[in-house]
Amino acid sequence: MTDENQAAPAEQAQEPVLQIQRIYVKDVSFEAPNLPDIFQQEWKPNLNFDLGTEAKQLGENLFEVTLNVSVETTLEDSGDAAFICEVKQAGVFTIGGLTDIQLTHALTSQCPNMLFPYARELVASLVNRGTFPPLNLAPVNFDALFLEHMRRVEEESAPEEQPTLN
């Protein structure tokens, strides 16, 4: 028997990898500019929730993904700001063996999906420490957001139909 038949091809397909290396709080801010006066008003909050992601390549197959969560709450009657909470929850991930579209999906959907529970817990804790009523952010469907983004990109890059002259 020879080893020639057992030799691996020079360029063997790399196995897909997505591993968490580290999860951390990159930045956090909590402001309650109208305390304690705000507690004298009826609690009818208007909540503004913003979400964003950033990704940065740190090295070969190594990426930092940051999930930006911003919650601003004002009172319906007066418009006074109750609190503003901003959290940047980040993680370092090893990601490899993926196509470009799979990598984009991992960076904009799968990694943020792993980070969101940490950010949600931190927001809830900060709001609680401000002695406001509990705030439990609903889960986010990052896959749906990714698909919507891809649909928009596809629509924008589609050539516009030219009118035909007869």
UniProtKB/Swiss-Prot annotation:
It holds the Pfam family SecB. The keyword Acyltransferase does not apply. It comes from the Bacteria. Keywords: Chaperone, Cytoplasm, Protein transport, Translocation, Transport. It is found in: Cytoplasm. Its main location: cytoplasm. The keyword Transferase does not apply. CDD domains: Translocase_SecB. InterPro entries: SecB (IPR003708), SecB-like_sf (IPR035958). One of its GO terms (biological process) is protein tetramerization. One of its GO terms (molecular function) is unfolded protein binding. Disulfide bonds: none annotated. GO terms for cellular component: cytoplasm. HAMAP family: SecB. Homotetramer, a dimer of dimers. One homotetramer interacts with 1 SecA dimer. One of the proteins required for the normal export of preproteins out of the cell cytoplasm. It is a molecular chaperone that binds to a subset of precursor proteins, maintaining them in a translocation-competent state. It also specifically binds to its receptor SecA. Belongs to the SecB family. PANTHER family: PROTEIN-EXPORT PROTEIN SECB, PTHR36918. This is Protein-export protein SecB. It comes from Actinobacillus succinogenes (strain ATCC 55618 / DSM 22257 / CCUG 43843 / 130Z). The gene is secB.
